[in-house]
């Protein structure tokens, strides 16, 4: 029940200077947004049920490497491929505990379209603030329902932009050097600094 997200983003993102890329599968989609995030862009992907299962290894990598991204999971009936048109809210524990290892993750659950709108903004803000993947969950009913939505005026919602390093070129860049505000700046791939990203 998530294709409508891709269809709308494919039409609307280019109008706003954004990019939409249709990948060949869920694993490639998750890995593509990790790479795009490392170049300094705000990124998201959307899936449902089994697709969310396929993304788990890459989500774990993004958690470990502290790469901000948003994953939308429009839940459907399961288990396995389940029933694409049947409502379910069965992926909440998977959002929290789905990947191997022990790490924190932020998961938000929406109960109507207004929640989805606001929580999408919140998800991006949280991802950028804490340099972590954020999962936004809602179910098939919300995914297919039509409902009135109040869109705030531009500038009415707080937007957190990525904190970029102020370390000049040719000076050692320490991406995890602590700061008083707790936020960690990032240097964009292809920018002034060369560094490796690993899940180790």
Each model region followed by its residue ranges:
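A short, terminal or domain-edge coil/loop segment
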Residues: 74-81, 99-104, 127-134, 189-199
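Short, solvent-exposed polar/charged micro-motifs at secondary-structure junctions
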Residues: 31-32, 118, 146-147
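Thiamine diphosphate
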Residues: 1-100, 104, 140
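Conserved thiamine diphosphate
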Residues: 86-140, 152, 164-168
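Histidine (H) residue identity feature
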Residues: 41, 86, 100-103, 113, ...
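Short, solvent-exposed amphipathic alpha-helical segments in soluble enzyme
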Residues: 9-12, 60-63, 121-126, 151-154
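Conformationally flexible catalytic loops at phosphate/diphosphate-handling active centers
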Residues: 134-200
């Amino acid at each position: 029940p998530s294709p409508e997200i891709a269809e709308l983003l494919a039409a609307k993102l280019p109008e706003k200077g954004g990019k939409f890329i249709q990948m060949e599968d869920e694993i490639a989609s998750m890995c593509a947004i990790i790479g795009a995030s490392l170049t300094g862009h705000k990124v998201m992907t959307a899936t449902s049920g089994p697709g969310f299962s396929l993304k788990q290894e890459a989500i774990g990598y993004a958690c470990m490497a502290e790469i901000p991204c948003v994953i939308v999971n429009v839940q459907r009936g399961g288990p396995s491929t389940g029933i694409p048109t049947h409502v379910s809210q069965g992926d909440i524990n998977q959002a929290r505990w789905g990947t191997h290892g022990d790490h924190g993750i932020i998961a938000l659950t929406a109960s109507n379209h207004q929640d989805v709108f606001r929580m999408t903004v919140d998800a991006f803000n949280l991802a950028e603030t804490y340099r972590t993947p954020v999962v936004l969950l809602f179910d098939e009913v919300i995914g297919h329902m039509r409902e009135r939505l109040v869109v705030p005026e531009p500038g009415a919602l707080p937007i957190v932009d990525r904190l970029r390093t102020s370390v000049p070129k040719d000076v050692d860049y320490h991406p995890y050097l602590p700061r008083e505000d707790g936020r960690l700046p990032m240097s964009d791939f292809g920018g002034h600094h060369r560094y490796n990203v690993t899940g180790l």
